[in-house]
């Protein structure tokens, strides 16, 4: 067969194979054209699931008579004119393929009128060469597109269409997604002459939540957490469902938009899933409605034929931006952790440590907590304190319950009265003084946060939480050289007062030694780097608390700041297992060998089994 140019109808039908998958694809393309035309009202009429009729009527700007024939031609569009336009697309459509493709597999009629014209005109294409006929018609300002008998001339495609109910369900889903993208547009959906959906235009935030509840359901609206997150040209807004109340029905609500364009992007979904993975069960999925705004030059939408996917020029930056935004609003929903039972490693008590241990409802909020509140992102509920070493324990799916049940049995067996706390942290029981190389062998985990150790024939309980705090303090305390600073992919910018600016300037040298790089300007401070132990923390809360702590100090000692940070970091473990405990003790023995020889108060407690054994003998 010789090489030849394909007839226009055949070429359009080939293109339609990518653009027109089913009736819902037609609705999507035509409604997006209406939105690009500035429509504020769109009426959608469907018959027999879209197989018989799809009619889209809008009150947009309309199409001039001289451009009607071009509108049905391939690669004819008013939305881009140069390569520069293609590299910064702000419209929903831009290829100029939709109308030509649809008209090649259905009987399409285009009727339109502009505000400058006194009459409307109607265009339709027919025949092998897709010749366009234009004739006068009656129509208000705007455009109406009628698509009759979809796939009438491609029987093979028509056989793949599902039932009327299924096809209309896909159309309904497309309209739902569009209604969530454009709150300012009224959208009416009719099927077989019956009104199915009416989404009235809204503007205010409260009314937006009303439409959100109408589309996503009252259950999602009740547990939705609002997100308002921004960095440079990146903005993330929307709602994510509280993982504590996520159900299989809610997990079906996963709507994401990039510059107003509905997307199913794997990078975005992965970032959201990663932010929620510690709060959801293995078989659960997050529920969200999120809007990402980004510089059009930084995203390529000319990737997927149906424009369902995009490619970000800085994909890692976008991924981490979304991850941090979702993670921050979820962490603010954690209940305030209980106060730690152990005293700090040093007898000195500082008021800011009360913050990390958990909010005290009977005390006034400290300046550090007030500072954190100023910097917290918007949430639909009152945020709870997320500091402290047990911040992750509130999530029910963090660890299975076996460890807690096992710990309860051991507590009953080893119910030994606690020995009086020594006056000095350096003082330790005499029977522990001989151990200089290792804490001993880990036998099991008790209560989720203590390890039962065997130490030369005797037993002892070690607080893993306290051991982790000592390890962090050792990691944060600089030696002969400053702690290595880890640059943040997205620098954190916070507003500060004049007093806080002066405190940061005075503490600049100490913070640099600790691996914290700051830059201050007139009203803000920008955190550019932090030490490794702080990388996985919620810096939106921790840094304001640190600034509040520094503002209360008269002198800035590196050791005291490192100690404060160690006590205020959120524990990475909600409930410990054997492998984690063994790894932690190995690190403590390597970095803090003095703790093995002279355990401080609150770290290690000998267990006396004699009373339990005597009780058994008495029986």
From Swiss-Prot:
InterPro entries: DNA_mismatch_repair_CS (IPR014762), DNA_mismatch_repair_MutL (IPR020667), DNA_mismatch_S5_2-like (IPR013507), HATPase_C_sf (IPR036890), MutL/Mlh/PMS (IPR002099), MutL/Mlh/Pms-like (IPR038973), MutL_C (IPR014790), MutL_C_dimsub (IPR042120). PROSITE patterns: DNA_MISMATCH_REPAIR_1. It comes from the Bacteria. CDD domains: HATPase_MutL-MLH-PMS-like, MutL_Trans_MutL. GO terms for molecular function: ATP binding; ATP hydrolysis activity; ATP-dependent DNA damage sensor activity; mismatched DNA binding. One of its GO terms (biological process) is mismatch repair. Pfam families: DNA_mis_repair, HATPase_c_3, MutL_C. This protein is involved in the repair of mismatches in DNA. It is required for dam-dependent methyl-directed DNA mismatch repair. May act as a 'molecular matchmaker', a protein that promotes the formation of a stable complex between two or more DNA-binding proteins in an ATP-dependent manner without itself being part of a final effector complex. This is DNA mismatch repair protein MutL. The lineage of its organism: Bacteria, Pseudomonadati, Pseudomonadota, Gammaproteobacteria, Enterobacterales.
């Amino acid at each position: 067969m010789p090489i030849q140019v394909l007839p226009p109808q055949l070429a359009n039908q080939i293109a339609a194979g990518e653009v027109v998958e089913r009736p819902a694809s037609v609705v999507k393309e035509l409604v997006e054209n209406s939105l690009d035309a500035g429509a504020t009202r769109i009426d959608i009429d469907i018959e027999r699931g879209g197989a018989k009729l799809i009619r889209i009527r809008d009150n947009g700007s309309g199409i001039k008579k001289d451009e009607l024939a071009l509108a049905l031609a391939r690669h004819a569009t008013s939305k881009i004119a140069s390569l520069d336009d293609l590299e910064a697309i702000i419209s929903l459509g831009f290829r100029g393929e939709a109308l030509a493709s649809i008209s090649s597999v259905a009987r399409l009629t285009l009727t339109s009128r502009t505000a400058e014209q006194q009459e409307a005109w109607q265009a339709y294409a027919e025949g092998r060469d897709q010749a366009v006929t234009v004739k006068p018609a009656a129509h208000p300002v705007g455009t109406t597109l009628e698509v009759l008998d979809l796939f009438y001339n491609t029987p093979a495609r028509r056989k793949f269409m599902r039932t009327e109910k299924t096809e209309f369900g896909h159309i309904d889903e497309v309209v739902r997604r569009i209604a969530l993208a454009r709150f300012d547009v009224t959208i009416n959906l009719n099927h077989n002459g019956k009104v199915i959906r009416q989404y009235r235009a809204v503007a205010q935030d409260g009314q937006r939540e009303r439409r959100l509840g109408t589309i996503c359901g009252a259950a999602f609206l009740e547990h939705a957490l609002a997100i308002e997150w921004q960095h440079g040209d990146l903005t993330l807004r929307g709602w994510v469902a509280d993982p504590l109340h996520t159900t299989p029905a809610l997990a079906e609500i996963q709507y994401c938009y990039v510059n107003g364009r509905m997307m199913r992007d794997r990078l975005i979904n992965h970032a959201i899933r990663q932010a929620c993975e510690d709060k959801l069960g293995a078989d659960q999925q997050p529920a969200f409605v999120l809007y990402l705004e980004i510089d059009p030059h930084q995203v390529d939408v000319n990737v997927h034929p149906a424009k369902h996917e995009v490619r970000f020029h800085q994909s890692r930056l976008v991924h981490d931006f979304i991850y941090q935004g979702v993670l921050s609003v979820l962490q603010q929903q954690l209940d305030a952790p209980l106060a730690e039972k152990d005293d700090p490693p040093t007898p000195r008590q500082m008021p800011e440590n009360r913050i990390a241990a958990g909010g005290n409802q009977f005390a006034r909020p400290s300046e550090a907590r007030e500072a954190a509140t100023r910097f917290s992102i918007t949430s639909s509920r009152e945020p709870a304190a997320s500091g402290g070493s047990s911040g992750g324990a509130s999530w029910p799916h963090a660890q299975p319950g076996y460890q807690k049940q096992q710990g309860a049995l051991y507590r009953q067996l080893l119910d030994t009265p606690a020995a009086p706390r020594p006056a000095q942290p350096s003082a330790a029981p005499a029977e522990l003084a001989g151990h200089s190389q290792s804490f001993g062998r880990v036998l099991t985990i008790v209560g989720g946060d203590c390890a039962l150790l065997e130490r030369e024939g005797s037993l002892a309980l070690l607080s893993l939480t306290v051991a982790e705090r000592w390890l962090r303090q050792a990691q944060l305390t600089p030696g002969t050289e400053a702690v290595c600073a880890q640059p943040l992919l997205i620098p954190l910018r916070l507003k500060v007062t004049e007093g806080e600016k002066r405190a940061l300037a005075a503490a600049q040298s100490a913070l640099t030694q600790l691996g914290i790089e700051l830059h201050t300007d007139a009203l803000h401070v920008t955190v550019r780097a932090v030490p490794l132990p702080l990388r996985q923390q919620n810096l939106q809360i921790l840094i304001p608390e640190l600034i509040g702590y520094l503002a209360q100090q008269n002198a800035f000692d590196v050791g005291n700041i490192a100690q404060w940070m160690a006590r205020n970091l959120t524990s990475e473990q909600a409930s410990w297992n054997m492998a984690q405990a063994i790894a932690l003790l190995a690190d403590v023995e390597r970095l803090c060998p003095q703790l093995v020889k002279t355990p401080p108060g609150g770290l290690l407690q000998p267990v006396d089994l004699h009373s339990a054994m005597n009780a058994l003998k008495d029986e």
